[in-house]
Amino acid sequence: MVEKMNEEVMDSKELQVGDVVTGSVTKVEEKQVLVNVGYKTDGVIPISELANVHIEKASDVVELDQILELKIIKLEENDLVLSKRAVDAEKAWIELQEKFTSGHVFDVTVKDIVNGGLVVDLGVRGFIPASLVEVHYVEDFTDYKGKTLAVKIVELDREKNRVILSHKAVVELELDSKKKEAISSLKEGDVVEGTVQRLTDFGAFVNVGGVDGLVHISQISHERVEQPSEVLEQGQKVKVKVLSVDADTQRISLSIKAAQPGPWENIAGEVKAGDIREGIVKRLVTFGAFVEILPGVEGLVHVSQIANRHVKNPNEVLEMGQEVKVKVLEVHVAEKRISLSIKEAFEENNVTEDYSQYEPNADSATFQLSDIIGEQLKKLKK
């Protein structure tokens, strides 16, 4: 059949360089292939004319009895040289232009690893730059040889014989699609499990269902957090509550503390008026001091409740981080408000010091309890 087809071509005109003929592979050698095209002698396809990418041996591309479309690149009396890659390239450019125009995604097999990226055979040489292989950094591409990748054409220039492909672009499209799907499945108020992906100074990014949401530092714990890395680590599983979802900007706000019982939920059974407790001074303000008596639970010691003597400014006798004893005066769970007193705790516990040394005698000036408390607070501050 091949001979008949080519006989018809040769009957109508003499074979010329540039003609396209059909041939059957009669012999596959290491560096060339012999093909019967109905000419008086078998044509030869040099290994360099088999493909548009580097190949080690001819058998990597063709096999015995395979039917090929070939272009005549040299024709002399007993010398017929043919090219498979020239025909492949002509067809390839037409197909590649269609794929480039439509943004079509298609599979390719990596033929070679070169400096700067990957080489594929598309009928013409295609190149995937290292920066366009994956969304993440790849140090060694050795394992990519022979691998099949989904790609799209990002640059096409026939005059320069330039075909640039991207696998990264396909991965990003898939990730974006999954992200939109994940976002659409999340609703404000949902409590879901996530994985800590990244930690920053302002919070933590947590992956929930394939999409990252931000847990602001203020939403990590009911207790004050200076650095997210103090309480969280990458890869940690956490329960989060969805605070808000913005499908347009693809932003998700999450809260770890909102997914946990609040420190005030069981406060009624733990703290009651009259209790004497140890606490830590967390904040000093002009009207008093906020003292933490349980993790995440602070009460106010009004400036009038710091000592029996007049205290103009709380920082005169107290400092941040200082440990103090306080008496619970009032507990208002609904308002999350607790009133505390340092001076009453001193009075009730009698400061645990022997104050007999301060008792006045006939020859000494009198002392007031306010002086004693003020002196003790100053000692604690030191």
Swiss-Prot record:
Task: Name the keywords, alphabetized.
Answer: Phosphoprotein, Repeat, Ribonucleoprotein, Ribosomal protein, RNA-binding
What Gene Ontology terms for biological process does this UniProt record contain? Answer: translation
Where in the numbering of this chain does the S1 motif domain appear?
A: 18-85, 103-168, 189-257, 274-343
Kindly name one Pfam family recorded for this protein: S1
- In the record, which positions carry Phosphoserine? S244
Q: Which InterPro entries match?
A: NA-bd_OB-fold, Ribos_protein_bS1-like, Ribosomal_protein_S1-like, S1_domain
Q: Does the keyword RNA-binding apply?
A: yes
Q: What's the family?
A: Belongs to the bacterial ribosomal protein bS1 family.
Under what name is this protein listed? Small ribosomal subunit protein bS1 homolog
What organism does this protein naturally occur in? Answer: Bacillus cereus (strain ATCC 10987 / NRS 248)
Give the gene that encodes this protein: rpsA
